[in-house]
Design a protein with these regions (language model features):
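Non-catalytic signal-transmission and effector/linker regions of two-component phosphorelay proteins
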Residues: 1-11, 17-37, 43-46, 50, ...
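Receiver (REC) domain active-site loop signature in two-component systems and cognate sites
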Residues: 70-73
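Negatively charged, flexible loop motifs adjacent to catalytic sites
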Residues: 89, 101-105
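Short, glycine/charged-rich "phosphate-handling" switch motifs in NTP-dependent
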Residues: 116
Length: 158
């Protein structure tokens, strides 16, 4: 990824340590140099997002991308997805469901709840990392300057 993409932190919520290691290894071997944070279950991720975990949260969806497994202990991916999309600080967080579940009803449920993409494991990692690069780029491009009014006349870009 280019230096512009290094501002995006990739969060992986995956309870299977082997799957998580494989995902991280494949991302690194494809040249992804972004910070990657691994969460072992949905509750650990949710605690991080809410600032209650052991790590420090930035409390802002900008600059993050979430790879989310569905079947996890304590708090499953569907519940995490639903909570994130209902949260005013995190609802814009890009979420890619990355799971072994290929049931069309599950896929539709994830899309209805607001996931940005649904990928079934195992997957072709070159295509996956290319998609991440495109999504990361679009995250940076989508950010627009805020217009602040000046004494009731027009606005000023900030």
């Amino acid at each position: 990824m280019t230096s512009a993409h290094t501002n995006v932190t990739i969060m992986i919520a995956e309870d299977d340590e082997g799957h998580a290691e494989l995902i991280m290894e494949q991302l690194r071997s494809a040249g992804v140099s972004n910070e990657i944070i691994h969460f072992r279950d949905g509750q650990e991720l949710w605690d991080y997002l809410m600032g209650a975990g052991q790590r420090t949260s930035r409390h802002d969806a900008h600059g993050f991308l979430l790879l989310l497994d569905i079947v996890m202990p304590r708090l499953d991916g569907l519940e995490v997805l639903q909570r994130i999309k209902a949260d005013k600080q995190w609802h814009n967080l890009p979420i890619i469901m990355l799971t072994t579940t290929d049931d069309p009803r599950e896929i539709e449920k994830c899309r209805t709840l607001g996931c940005n993409c649904y990928i079934t494991k195992p997957m072709e990692y070159e295509r996956f990392t290319e998609m991440l690069k495109r999504l990361g780029l679009s995250l940076l491009v989508v950010q627009t300057p805020k217009i602040q009014p000046q004494n009731g006349q027009g606005g000023k870009l900030t």
